[in-house]
A protein has these predicted regions:
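Short, Lys/Arg-enriched N-terminal segment that forms or immediately precedes the first helix
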Residues: 1-5, 89
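S-adenosyl-L-methionine
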Residues: 6, 10, 25
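The short coil/loop that forms the "turn" connecting the two helices of the helix-turn-helix
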Residues: 10-11, 42
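Alpha-helical structural segments
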Residues: 14-21, 25, 39, 49, ...
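Ser/Thr-centered, proline-biased regulatory motifs
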Residues: 28-38
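Key DNA-contact positions within bacterial/archaeal DNA-binding proteins
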Residues: 45
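Helical hydrophobic small-molecule/effector-binding pocket
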Residues: 85-109, 114-122
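Hydrophobic/aromatic-rich alpha-helical bundle segments in the mid-to-C-terminal region
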Residues: 118-129, 135-196
Length: 196
């Protein structure tokens, strides 16, 4: 009996998810198509044949992650009569779930730090603008609500990517005080886990 061949879209997704893990761990410069191929369990030639270059693979992996983030926000089960506080809490809880996926979190952080990169700057800016527009147009936040939500998210990203709690625990707790008691601690624990 012949082995069933995986459809092309599933193979592409397998490689994109592997690329997200590798780029999240080591960044664009240190990642190689070979390391991504090993992570995906395919040959380097297969990755190159599918994506042509590491640059294209990074662009597609970044777009994949941003689209996942935007989809989660756009599909949030927010009632039409929910208060601003209820909406922020629901979206904040959703973002906290996203942050638990360390690879997705680090890919977003790395992408949003590349605004001045000559290759990826436009992708970085477009991706951030896409998230903002989803919050405004799909979620229904006004400009002030979207700014507050994004500022809290970016503070979380910064504190977590700096691992600020390792040397400045009181400061990290103060900065993330808007999360509420115990939630910052839970975030630290997730990022203290092996492989994070």
């Amino acid at each position: 009996m012949a082995a069933t061949r995986m459809p092309a879209n599933e193979r592409k997704l397998l490689m994109l998810e592997a690329a997200v893990r590798v780029f999240a761990r080591v960044g664009y410069a240190a990642a190689t198509t070979d390391s991504i191929a090993r992570e995906a369990g395919v040959s380097q030639a297969y990755v190159v044949r599918f994506f042509r270059s590491k640059e294209t693979l990074f662009e597609e992996a970044a777009t994949y992650v941003v689209e996942q983030l935007c989809r989660r926000f756009a599909e949030a089960p927010i009632a039409a009569d929910s208060t601003d506080a209820e909406r922020r809490k629901l979206l904040g809880d959703m973002y906290a779930e996203i942050v638990k996926d360390h690879d997705m979190f680090m890919m977003i952080v790395r992408l949003f730090m590349m605004g001045s990169d000559p290759r990826f700057g436009q992708l970085s800016r477009d991706s951030f603008a896409r998230v903002y527009r989803v919050l405004r147009e799909d979620v229904g936040m006004d400009a002030q609500q979207a700014r507050l939500f994004l500022s809290h998210g970016l503070l979380m990203n910064l504190v977590l990517s700096l691992r600020l709690w390792e040397g400045e625990r009181d400061l990290a707790d103060e900065i993330l005080g808007f999360l509420g008691k115990g939630r910052a601690e839970a975030m630290y624990s997730l990022h203290d886990a092996p492989g994070s």
